[in-house]
């Protein structure tokens, strides 16, 4: 068997609302729609429950992309949760952009319980987009408390290199 | 200034208030002062060195000040926005505070500087100030001084906005790598009044307490999100920051974005609801599929 270079498979976390998108994703599954297997679904009561910190935490823990999805406007199970979320994410998306995060890694969408096909498209589009962007090494590399020390020079340099300590 | 001392003496003398929160001359420039004795009202000063946002002393996180009794607080136009914010969010009752507004001609960057205003010394927030006269007050003092000079140099927020994305990331990574997570930006802020902060939560720990660039970014993203549409723009977080991180840039950028998007400017009218916590059914949603 010819060995191929391992292709980058992005980790994508989807924060979805219980009432629309989760049910829509369920419909996509029961309808046997084929879609990229890169998405991990986190079910929440409502998009209004999704704190921007969830997205930050997902990136911190190694996600390469994030999907946030819930009920269409006027369809919220709790009447107004998605309207609040819409304002919040309009600001948060712009804030991330200002801080230098590529917002193409985050997809916001409204997917209703009957839109299994739309969910498939959201998943496939996001996966393809993030695949193209590559791993989110910028964010994941932030976990190092200090920038790597410059390579040692002069006396004792070789011994410390041999020990693997910077 | 005499007007201010006169008023403080009167308010304390007739028992309207128990403490006047104002400014006094300190060993290193001007500093906040809590005057409880009418005879001490002479200590009060007001000039271009009065940088501090005294509204922060009304913050319910400071119960030791509340124990002194009903306060009167000296506010500039920008500080009045913070008082209005606390009234809007039910942290302070309007009738529980006497607001002494002062007409302001701009302040310097640091209270230890000389009171002379020049493009190099003027606080960046004063450059385009449209609220040198507070609209929320019980007493309004002084005559309106001439407008402050524009700060030297170009607009720093626009400069960061115009950077290409990777450069912006590198810029903030570098700036935030200096953060020591002392949370002075939170402590000094009049609008940060949660009894328990998410940054102090350990189970689950949403924001790491160590000062790694990753945790620092989490912290600032969270803080700024909580400030969106609420920040009075007083710049105290930047002044309090021991690592000189330009936090005001982020807050100013978000404030501009909120204004562009929702047509909302933080104002000193407590009856106007803030954009987060309110919504319109036809808010634009071009970024949502």
Predicted regions and their residues:
Chain B
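Alpha-helix boundary/capping residues
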Residues: 87-90, 179, 257
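Active-site-adjacent beta-strand anchor residues
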Residues: 73-76, 179, 240
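Ferredoxin-type iron-sulfur electron-transfer modules in oxidoreductases and energy-metabolism complexes
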Residues: 151-177, 191-289
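A generic "binding-loop/recognition-motif" signal
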Residues: 79, 185, 237
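Short Cys/His-rich metal-coordination motifs, predominantly Zn2+-binding knuckles/fingers
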Residues: 129, 182, 234
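Iron-sulfur-associated redox domains of electron-transfer enzymes in respiratory
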Residues: 1-172, 190
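Oxyanion-binding "anion nests"
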Residues: 182-190
């Amino acid at each position: 068997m010819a060995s191929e270079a391992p292709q980058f498979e992005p980790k994508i976390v989807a924060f979805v609302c219980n009432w629309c998108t989760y049910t829509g994703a369920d419909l996509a599954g029961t309808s046997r729609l084929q879609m990229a297997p890169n998405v991990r679904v986190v079910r929440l009561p409502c998009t209004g429950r999704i704190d921007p910190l969830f997205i930050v935490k997902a990136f911190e823990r190694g996600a390469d992309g994030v999907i946030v999805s819930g009920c269409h406007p006027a369809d919220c199970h709790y009447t107004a949760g998605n309207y609040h979320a819409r304002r919040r994410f309009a600001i948060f998306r712009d804030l991330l952009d200002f801080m230098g995060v590529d917002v193409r890694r985050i997809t916001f969408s409204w997917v209703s319980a009957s839109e299994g096909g739309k969910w498939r498209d959201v998943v496939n589009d996001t996966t393809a987009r993030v695949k193209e962007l590559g791993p989110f090494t910028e964010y994941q590399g932030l976990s190092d408390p200090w920038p790597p020390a410059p390579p040692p020079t002069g006396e004792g340099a070789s011994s410390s290199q041999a020990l693997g300590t910077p | 200034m005499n007007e201010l001392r006169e008023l403080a003496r009167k308010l304390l003398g007739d028992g309207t208030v128990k403490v006047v929160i104002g400014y006094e001359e300190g060993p290193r420039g001007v500093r906040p002062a809590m005057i409880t004795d009418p005879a001490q009202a002479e200590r009060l000063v007001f000039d271009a060195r009065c940088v501090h946002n005294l509204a922060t002393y009304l913050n319910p996180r400071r119960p030791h000040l509340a124990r002194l009794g009903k306060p009167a607080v000296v506010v500039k136009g920008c500080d009045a926005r913070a008082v209005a914010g606390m009234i809007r969010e039910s942290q302070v009752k309007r009738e529980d505070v006497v607001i002494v507004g002062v007409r302001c001609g701009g302040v310097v960057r640091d209270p230890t500087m000389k009171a002379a205003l020049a493009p190099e010394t003027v606080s960046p927030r004063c450059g385009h100030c449209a609220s040198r006269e507070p609209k929320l007050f019980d007493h309004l003092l002084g005559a309106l001084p001439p407008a402050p000079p524009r700060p030297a140099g170009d607009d720093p927020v626009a400069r960061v906005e115009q950077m290409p994305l990777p450069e912006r990331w590198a810029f903030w990574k570098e700036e935030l790598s200096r953060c020591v997570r002392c949370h002075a930006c939170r402590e000094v802020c009049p609008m940060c009044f949660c009894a328990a902060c998410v940054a102090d939560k350990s189970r689950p720990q949403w924001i790491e307490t160590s000062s790694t660039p990753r945790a620092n970014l989490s912290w600032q993203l969270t803080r700024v999100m909580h400030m969106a549409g609420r920040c009075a723009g007083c710049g105290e977080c930047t002044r309090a920051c021991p690592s000189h991180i330009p936090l005001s840039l982020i807050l100013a950028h978000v404030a501009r974005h909120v204004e562009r998007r929702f047509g909302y400017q933080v104002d000193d009218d407590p009856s106007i609801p803030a954009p987060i916590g309110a919504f319109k059914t036809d808010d634009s949603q071009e970024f949502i599929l």
